[in-house]
Amino acid sequence: ERPVMIMADRLRLEQVIINLVRNALDAMKGSDTRELDILLTVGDSAVLAVRDTGAGIENLETLFEPFYTTKKPGDGVGLGLAISSGIITDLGGRLSARNGVDGGAVFEIVLPMLENRDVEAAE
């Protein structure tokens, strides 16, 4: 198979993925079932989905607003998703969230595929 090629700053993309995974792990702390799925699908765009079995998302409308948090004071200031959304937007993509069909949350990063595949991939 061919590698999935996107134009992105590797460190900034890693920051977003780490933030989504940490949020998913935090969301599942009180769950009896703890499953975290990271799925990559490719079509016209590259789509990376982070899916958890936590309680789901109550306030989808304000989720990406700066300083919005569901965490206890001292556990987070509510900037992670706002920053992550900004990073993905800067890369020409979008970050979205929804509740999973069977519960939990699903976050999707959609990024355009690199058209010129003659470029070397970052390690």
Q: In which residue ranges do the predicted regions lie?
A:
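A residue-level detector for a conserved hydrophobic packing site
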Residues: 13-14
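Short conserved segment of the HATPase_c
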Residues: 57-67
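Conserved catalytic submotifs in the C-terminal HATPase_c
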Residues: 1-4, 43
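Short alpha-helical Gxxx[C/S/T] motif in the catalytic ATP-binding
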Residues: 80-84
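Conserved micro-motifs of the catalytic ATP-binding
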Residues: 5-8, 70
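Short beta-strand/loop element within the Bergerat-fold HATPase_c
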Residues: 33-44
